Design a protein with these regions (language model features):
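Glycine-centered tight beta-turn/hairpin loop motif at sheet-sheet or coil-to-beta transitions
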Residues: 42, 66, 85-87, 141-145, ...
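Beta-strand-dominated lipid-handling architectures at cellular/organellar boundaries
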Residues: 33, 52, 72-74, 79, ...
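Amphipathic hydrophobic-ligand
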Residues: 43-47, 71-74, 145-147, 173-175
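Bacterial Sec signal peptide processing site at the extreme N-terminus
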Residues: 2-21
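Gly/Pro-enriched, hydrophobic low-complexity segments
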Residues: 118-184
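Flexible, processing/modification-adjacent segments and terminal tails
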Residues: 86-140, 144
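Post-signal-peptide N-terminal segment of Sec-exported extracytoplasmic proteins
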Residues: 23-59, 63-64, 70
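An acidic-aromatic
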Residues: 57-106
Length: 184
């Protein structure tokens, strides 16, 4: 009798964390495209997600299923610009504060540059999973405890990058599914 067994790539892959961490730390230019689902006690919505990081500058674009802009956010170390779905432009110096003030949604924008790629920079605690990549991290930001659970990774990328993660704080839950990574 002959046969073959196949394993999912997530199970068969294992990385060396110090090497993975070093490679992630060197990523200064990348783009992630996928989907975002947001849920709390008051609202729920889904959006197409496009995140770009270029050194310390970030660009977040959320669009609906028709491709219409919901939010466009550009951050630099010194300034933040948010454009809403009506085309109104807002400026500030703190991305999380500006998003919260205009949408009512709390997001740890400043930490997402690293957390999105599975780098636990500035996290209070983190744990590696069986594949040797970050499976969980947590960070206290003011009175809020933010937790990121990494569900799946794309091991075809080098370094391996998250493809599904859940960010939560209290009753807020944000599911991120990354369909495409572009490392520049």
């Amino acid at each position: 009798m002959t046969g073959c067994a196949s394993q999912s790539p997530e199970i068969s892959q294992k990385v060396n964390w110090p090497t993975q961490e070093q490679q992630l730390s060197k990523l200064t230019h990348y783009q992630a495209s996928g989907k975002l689902a947001y849920k709390d006690n008051q609202q729920r919505f889904g959006a197409n997600l496009n995140w770009q990081t270029n050194n310390q500058n970030d660009h977040l674009l959320l669009t609906n299923f028709l491709g219409q802009t919901l939010i466009k956010l550009d951050t630099t170390p010194k300034s933040v610009t948010l454009i809403d779905y009506k085309g109104n432009e807002y400026h500030g110096t703190n991305a999380a504060e500006l998003v919260r003030r205009l949408t009512g949604i709390n997001l740890p924008i400043e930490q997402m540059q690293n957390w999105l790629i599975g780098l636990p920079t500035a996290a209070d605690t983190f744990q590696l999973n069986d594949q040797g990549v970050v499976g969980y991290l947590a960070k206290q930001i003011g009175p809020q405890l933010w937790e990121m659970h990494y569900q799946e990774y794309d091991f075809s990328q080098h370094p391996a990058l998250p493809s599904k993660m859940i960010l939560s704080q209290g009753k807020q839950k944000i599911t991120l599914v990354i369909n495409e990574w572009n490392l520049k």
